[in-house]
Amino acid sequence: MPANLTPEYKAVEAAFRKARDPRERLEGLREMLRTIPKHKGTDHLQGDIKRRIKELSEELDRPQRGGARGGPALVIRPEGAAQIALIGPPNAGKSSLHARLTGSAAPAAPYPFTTQYPEPGMMPHENISLQLVDLPAVSPEHPVPWLASALQTADAALLVVDLCDPASLEQIEAVRTILRERRVTLTDRWEPAGESPGVAAEGDGDPFVLRLPTLLVANKVEGLADGDAELRAFLEVTGLRYPAFTVSAATGQGLGNIGPWLFSHLGIARVYTKAPGRPPDRGRPFILHRGQTVEDVARLVHTDLARSLRYARIWGTSGFDGQQVGREHPVEDGDVIELHS
């Protein structure tokens, strides 16, 4: 039986697809359950929504690290300008890479399955930080039941491989297959500016399919005579079309390319505000995505300001200096905005 979903439900589902904060996602799921038409054609979807509400509620109610009964968090609340998940097979060097990029003290060892729980860390880039979350290795020999749930808050993924290991060819396909079975697709498509990364395209039919834009990170090239040639051969044999870099977590080779590349392809826009007659506050920018608007900036400052906003003046690439613009004016990275209510 066709689902015959209503416009109200579709709007709620679209908002859920874009949500990254776990509590926002939980509220979105509850709204989806409230607005979904109740008939046999939606029975399966209703059951899926109820199951996810239960799982996410239990995770959010679970005492966290340091609590009397709790353990490490399985879902990491996003921080910084974006959340990037580190994914890969055993012994690919994810934890060493994470430690190099973030300065974290996450355990790293030359044996598999060192990482047992999500390990967050912050990678600085210019005047912002990107949150990198090291996840347990993906392998059929060591299933991680909560892995797909942990990925729901991510904006993108780093798929880490050991370029020196001939087994990487089969391991990467196993990683992709396991994730697909859990309705997570590592895609080579990075959305155009203004579109949220990590969101299933509307029209997929399944609101719970997650498509994570992915950068392939070919690690351990310190052991190769020509890492770039090996990477080209690896991509040709596997048929993968991911954007890719060669790096060495051991020596630091190539690591400086990752932050700038992620920043440019995530479409991040740093926006600064100013009061009339005063210089802009450049200490801490508001973080948006290119294509978001002046109204979105006002909402980040205060929800009441978003409602009362009359116009703004803007300095930057999205307009000439001091130009008066309306609430729907799109912002660009580096814009300075003066909000008037």
Region spans (language model):
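C-terminal-of-GTPase-core extension/linker across diverse P-loop GTPases
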Residues: R17-A82, I87, A92, H98, ...
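Short, charge-rich amphipathic alpha-helices with coiled-coil/heptad character
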Residues: M1-N4, R30
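A conserved segment at the C-terminal end of the G1
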Residues: N91-P107, Q116
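Short beta-alpha junctions and helix-cap segments that line functional grooves
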Residues: A109-P110, V144-L147, Q324-R327
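Conserved protein kinase catalytic core
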Residues: A106, P140, S168, A225-D226, ...
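Switch II of P-loop NTPase G domains
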Residues: K10-R17, Q64-A82, T102, F113-P120, ...
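Acidic, Ser/Thr-rich peripheral helices and adjacent loops at domain boundaries
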Residues: T177-L186, F263
